[in-house]
């Protein structure tokens, strides 16, 4: 036991990468088990249609222009599809999961460089993987946000790196280059992050005049040239740039206070910090160590921590004032909190002995409760869809026991033992919860229906008839489109007409045509053939 703790104390970098290596199977097991859901099918559709149409400049869904997001992430996903020759859920999620690990590594190295305390770097990087939000939700979805946030966080770090060296050209050039890339991922939020970060840093340090320097202006022009080159190429295929830009603006502004009113916004602002502390649990337990009288002076006296605090508050208010902000929009800001919390933990835990003791009892108590709960998996009929259930339960129980014992016995590394337990919880989630969801989810029924329709209609036109979904229904319909197109490797089309020969899919109506033959009914969805 002492040898393990001695290793963790002497070689924090090796400990970090060892835990990262152990985390690989934890997050990758059963990654492709669930059908696509939420925003995943939208990203997958755009990438797939680029491949089918051989047009990578113009995002489309169902052959119609898709304006909500620029295409950089879709290019990455399409590249993976082509590289692997595979259009599975597993491959669809790789552009999110691989950057998640790269993000953790980036946090580790940047914190190691700027703070020179690898304990803080290890904890900050690992907390990105094991906070509640990432542990059981974002880490299993092929969303754009982890990749986007990784690039944005990298820009934050490069800005400070070049600021410290007073290399103004490289500060502006590299951050604007990343802004161009992130704009081509997600649109206007990238401009907001770049603008607020630069203005806050330069205003606080008395360097606002640098905004008018040739170095800043040239870098900004370079950014606009990259973005402009994309839109110029896009214009060759679709001259409706106004519709594209208006939609990108609407996507960025639709969740703001102007849409929801003063009362709803006020209530949201009150619950915002508590809600996100919940999303980040158990990492947010480290807030306990921020209640030391030296906490704020400690931030002010450290140039890097002060910068982190400045850019956090410079950017967070936009989301604090925007009802219905989704936690994944803040993934580039969460590591700033993990960094500050980790610094507080290692700096003030010896000065707050009662708090430290309470914290240790909390994580030990949570570990014991989790360990005792593991055998309950044997009583939920999981054997219907989990092979070797008893063996897997024994494995998870043993791993939880080992981690709990380490937490109990360690003197200085209890938190790393707890992180080991959290990774074990995620492994249990992958082994038990994901198969349970896959077995019971209605999405499997519709996935099978879409694949069946794809096989039946192969080689012939396929139309979605009078397709006018509400916003909340779009992910459901996009999922159907993806599985149909993946099976056919041809685009579906949207139509208001019912006289063309081919196959028709209707959502809320019959196909009133003498030549229409009803082939299948999938609950309230109908599949017709018109000859």
Language-model features, listed with the residues they occupy:
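Membrane-embedded architecture of ER/inner-membrane glycosylation machinery
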Residues: 173, 293-485, 493, 508-512, ...
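Membrane-interface alpha helices of multi-pass inner-membrane proteins
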Residues: 170-186, 315-320
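Transmembrane-lumen/periplasm boundary regions of multi-pass, lipid-linked membrane glycan transferases
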Residues: 190-302, 311-327, 336-339, 356-364, ...
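Transmembrane-helix signature of polytopic, membrane-embedded enzymes
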Residues: 13-17, 107-130
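Short acidic/glycine- and proline-prone juxtamembrane loop motifs at membrane-interface regions
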Residues: 139-147
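Extracytosolic helix-loop segments that constitute the early lumenal/periplasmic catalytic or substrate-binding loops
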Residues: 24-28, 42-68, 72-75, 254, ...
